[in-house]
């Protein structure tokens, strides 16, 4: 029951503005009221993680966006991963899969372009699962669950892991700066 908005200079990683709801209320005596959701609130990021999964394959030098996969559904262990529209778009390229936000496409990248350890290390390189170094109290590191194959599959499209808004801002800054890591 909260929202966050933030503006950042992508080249310097400087936070220009940040706000959210509920806002600080000095009359409310609970610890949550004293936390900054930009750094404290960890959440399942959903499809925003697809950007980083694709970037991991691109950075490894193995990504071929013209290769095709069958969208719709895929089985991973005992779970069925579905595209958001439940039917997919037939056989499409990985580039189209990114455009259509295909859960199946990003899931099939594991084993095809990346293995689970490479994905986890790449997510860590982008700062997920650790503190960013920002000078604000109560920063959450989030969590990266990669124990089971279905957890890895879900992580590719932002389910089953927890991240913070500041981690996403820092990761996007790294992309904008050609991989250079800056502290917000």
Question: What does each model-found stretch correspond to?
Answer:
Residues 40-49:
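Gly/Ser-rich catalytic serine loop of serine hydrolases
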Residues 3-41, 55-184:
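Beta-lactam-recognizing serine transpeptidase/beta-lactamase-like catalytic domain environment
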């Amino acid at each position: 029951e909260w929202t966050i908005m933030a503006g950042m200079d992508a080249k310097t990683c400087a936070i220009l503005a940040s706000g959210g709801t509920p806002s600080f209320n000095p009359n409310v005596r609970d610890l949550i009221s004293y936390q900054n959701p930009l750094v404290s609130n960890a959440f399942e990021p959903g499809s925003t993680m697809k950007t980083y999964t694709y970037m991991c394959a691109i950075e490894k030098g193995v990504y071929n966006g013209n290769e095709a996969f069958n969208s719709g559904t895929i089985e991973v262990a005992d779970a069925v991963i579905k595209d958001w529209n439940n039917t997919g778009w037939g056989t499409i390229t990985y580039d189209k899969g990114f455009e259509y936000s295909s859960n199946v496409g990003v899931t099939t990248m594991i084993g095809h372009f990346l293995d689970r350890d490479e994905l986890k290390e790449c997510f860590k390189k982008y700062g997920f699962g650790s503190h960013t170094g920002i000078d604000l109290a109560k920063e959450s590191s989030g969590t990266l669950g990669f124990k089971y194959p279905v957890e890895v599959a879900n992580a590719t499209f932002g389910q089953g892991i927890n991240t913070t808004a500041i981690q996403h801002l820092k990761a996007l800054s790294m992309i904008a700066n050609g991989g250079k890591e800056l502290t917000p």
